[in-house]
Regions:
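Helix-turn-helix DNA-binding elements, focusing on the entry/boundary residues of the two helices
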Residues: 17-18, 29
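Recognition helix of helix-turn-helix/homeodomain-like DNA-binding domains
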Residues: 26-41
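Short alpha-helical "recognition helix" segments of helix-turn-helix
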Residues: 20-22
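DNA major-groove recognition helix of helix-turn-helix/homeodomain DNA-binding modules
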Residues: 44-61
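A short, Lys/Arg-rich alpha-helix, primarily the initiator
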Residues: 1-14, 48-51
Length: 61
């Protein structure tokens, strides 16, 4: 998952800040920051979780 894709998923899921996402998925805000800056790749389980949440949200509406 690219930093742009992560940002897009965050917005679509209603996470307005890095801290919002970090709290929701149980990681540190600094980890989210590193992912968004592209310094560290988004771990595969996190990317999968965000994609699943987005799909579930789309199906609910």
């Amino acid at each position: 998952m690219s930093p742009d894709e992560l940002q897009s998923h965050m917005r679509a899921l209603g996470y307005r800040t890095q801290n919002d996402l970090a709290n929701a998925i149980g990681v540190s805000r600094s980890a989210v920051s590193l992912w968004l800056e592209g310094k560290v790749g988004v771990p595969r389980p996190v990317a999968m979780l965000l994609r699943m949440l987005l799909q579930a949200q789309r199906r609910a509406f």
